[in-house]
């Protein structure tokens, strides 16, 4: 399954009236930005502004890029265990498919210890 498929299992904590941006758009943006080095809400927003064309290859972002306060509010409202489970399930699936014992998300390799 793809990252998007795993992220789609996460429940949206918002009421319908407060859903200008799709949850899956926000989650995909946040994970992509953090995996690319973003360290805060403003970094995530900046990544989204700079990479909107790339992000739209995978998700519509029909209402454009959310502001950093929206990103923060929605991510903080998520069930952390549910998010963690979805993300780790995806990582483990990628790891198993690649035949690796572990995956370095920071781009570094680890030396095997004797």
Task: Please tell me what each predicted stretch does.
Residues 1-113:
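Dynamic "connector" segments at or just before major functional cores
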């Amino acid at each position: 399954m793809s990252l998007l498929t795993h992220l789609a299992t996460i429940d949206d904590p918002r009421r319908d009236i407060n859903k200008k941006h799709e949850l899956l758009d926000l989650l995909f943006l946040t994970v992509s930005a953090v995996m690319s080095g973003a360290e805060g809400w403003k970094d995530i927003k900046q990544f989204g502004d700079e990479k909107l064309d790339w992000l739209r290859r995978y998700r519509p972002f029909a209402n454009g890029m959310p502001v950093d306060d929206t990103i923060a509010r929605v991510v903080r409202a998520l069930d952390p265990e549910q998010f963690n489970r979805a993300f780790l399930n995806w990582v483990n699936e990628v790891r198993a498919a690649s035949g690796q014992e572990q995956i370095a998300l920071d781009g570094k390799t680890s030396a095997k210890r004797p």
